[in-house]
């Protein structure tokens, strides 16, 4: 925060926007731009078969109380955002021996430093895998087909079952 202030950035934490204060108000008051950091505080369903199995957990719930979960030795993390990086690192620090993170494409939401920290802690990254369903054995993926700009354009035939405890 100190570095941001030195750069001339004004910070208004814990400010409710939309009630008595609007983004237009901030711009009128001299703010050149507005960053709204809402965080990820609600679990998001994947909408796939198997996401309600006993070996499937929402990352945000796990991060709130890691000691309440017994993930096992081999953990699969679906997605590569900052919260997913936190899940991977926390799982490794809480006894998981192998944590593999999966992304549908090559573009990820996590910052480069979050990814670097997860890699230093031992997380593995697998790109080009789209989750189809989850079984008691672990996630089932389709392999993504990507164009020269690393955009997903389709999926290869067949599926790949991977093994994971959670």
Write out the residue ranges for each language-model feature.
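Rossmann-like NAD(P)H-binding beta-loop-alpha module
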Residues: 69-96
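A Rossmann-like FAD-binding core segment of flavoenzymes
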Residues: 1, 5-44, 57-67, 71, ...
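Short amphipathic alpha-helical segments
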Residues: 46-50, 88-90, 113
């Amino acid at each position: 925060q100190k570095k941001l202030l030195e750069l001339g950035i004004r910070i208004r934490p814990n400010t409710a926007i939309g009630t008595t204060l609007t983004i237009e108000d901030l711009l009128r008051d001299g703010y050149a731009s507005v960053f709204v950091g809402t965080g990820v505080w609600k679990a998001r369903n994947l909408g796939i078969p198997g996401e309600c199995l006993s070996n499937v957990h929402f990352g945000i719930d796990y991060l709130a109380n890691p000691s309440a979960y017994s993930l096992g030795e081999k953990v699969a993390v679906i997605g590569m955002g900052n919260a997913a990086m936190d899940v991977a690192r926390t799982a490794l620090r809480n006894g998981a021996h192998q944590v593999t993170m999966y992304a549908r494409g090559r573009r990820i939401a996590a910052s480069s430093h979050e990814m670097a920290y997860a890699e230093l802690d031992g997380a593995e990254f697998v790109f080009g895998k789209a989750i189809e369903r989850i079984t008691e054995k672990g996630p089932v993926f389709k392999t993504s087909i990507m164009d020269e700009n690393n955009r997903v354009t389709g999926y290869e035939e067949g599926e790949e079952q991977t093994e994971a405890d959670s």
